[in-house]
Amino acid sequence: YNTEGILCPDCQGILKYEHNTYANLGAYICEGCGCKRPDLDYRLTELVELTNNRSRFVIDGQEYGIQIGGLYNIYNALAAVAIARFLGADSQLIKQGFDKSRAVFGRQETFHIGDKKCTLVLIKNPVGATQAIEMIKLAPYPFSLSVLLNANYADGIDTSWIWDADFEQITDMDIPEINAGGVRHSEIARRLRVTGYAAEKITETSSLEQVLKTIENQDCKHAYILATYTAMLEFRELLA
């Protein structure tokens, strides 16, 4: 898994990690040429709260909060803090900015299909997909899952990356049903069956309109939709 991510960018040797956050992120060093993670100017010093739709955390003594879930979005927030502080913004101004931030355009975008509360999450590579899966795993309620896989140029025509994403985690979640949809619905359905999730609970269709209708008629009151880029755009058009 992610073998490219553990190769030294200077000499292509194998990186060693003192600790690993996720994927290739963490405190690394190459024993061959000495390449290592640069010293940090800003760092997360405490994780106060992490849920599927929000988080609170401390960066160098200052607590911040964002209204979007997942560890990967805390990384995004850390980058925003570093840039804002570099440009001269104080912590209070940064907090105000975070307080106004909301999920947008397929990045944990929320909407209703009938009386079902739905969350749409873009996936496009194994690391991002795995982080999205870990984020939905934090949900404290049952939800249906739809995974929409297209293979247009904007998605990437090679869909083999789905085998490097950690879909196996779905077997630990309260998911009563799964919809496999999109142009490559058979491929993502096969990937989901391999996890050990009950095959009879996986519905497979190329029609995103049918996926929408299935969500509308499901018993579960919550739904997560993980979609590649063009599948996300097509699904959003159906909601207009």
Where are each of the predicted segments found?
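Gly/charged, well-structured mid-domain segments that form the phosphate/adenylate-handling core
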Residues: 35, 50-52, 83-123
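A glycine-rich beta-strand to alpha-helix segment
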Residues: 208-240
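Active-site beta-alpha connecting loops in nucleotide-dependent enzymes
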Residues: 1-6, 104, 122-204
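Glycine-rich phosphate-binding loop signature in dinucleotide/nucleotide-binding domains
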Residues: 87, 138-142, 215-222
